[in-house]
Amino acid sequence: MADRPPIDEDRRRLSAWLWRLPVLLATGGAVYGVQLAYRVHFAKVAPADPPTFADAPTVAVAPLARFAAPWASETFALAGLPCVAVRVPEPVPGGKTVGAGDQAVHLIGFSRVCTHQQCIVDLNTDLELVAFAFNHRTDRPTLTCGCHYSVFDPLGAGRAVSGPAVRPLPRVRLQVAVDGGEASIVADGVETDG
């Protein structure tokens, strides 16, 4: 047999490790993907019941008459925080009910800052758009974040129901103020983490 050069053991060890690198990377990626999927789909945080509010300077939201029908909404700023007040068809923990019986008006206020990446959420009443663009089928309007497609349920006290957000939207404390016989909605507090 012809003379063969000696086998380089260091090179052989390197080759043995090089084939392991893609396997380790793929395994790490799979573990991360499973962990992320679990966190996004099964580890969403429930809103506090009852909520704890931190006081804020009182600001006017809108006259009560502007909330004439369910899902009517008004945006406003509370201490520099973008917020929304929504009339909902039933009472929600942390919300405000004005009146009684069939004439009752149920309102809930939320911060409009998404708990995922701090983008601004909007009340979305187009159910087909929510189903198509946000991949969430629902039978009622939702608060949606167009940045990363998180969806929050106003009747669920702002609970994150779809998308990467796992924490609920902070609720805003709403009150009724009467001035000159006309009822108005004001805001004077924001939910704390507890």
Where are these regions (language model features)?
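Hydrophobic alpha-helical membrane-insertion segments, chiefly the h-region
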Residues: L25-A37
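N-terminal pre-ligand scaffold of iron-sulfur
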Residues: A16, Q35-F134, P154, P170-G194
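Soluble extracytoplasmic domains of inner/organellar membrane proteins
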Residues: T115, G146-H148
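N-terminal secretory signal peptides and thylakoid transit peptides that target proteins
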Residues: A2-L25
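Short cysteine/histidine-rich metal-coordination sites, predominantly Zn2+-binding motifs
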Residues: E128-G146, R159-L169
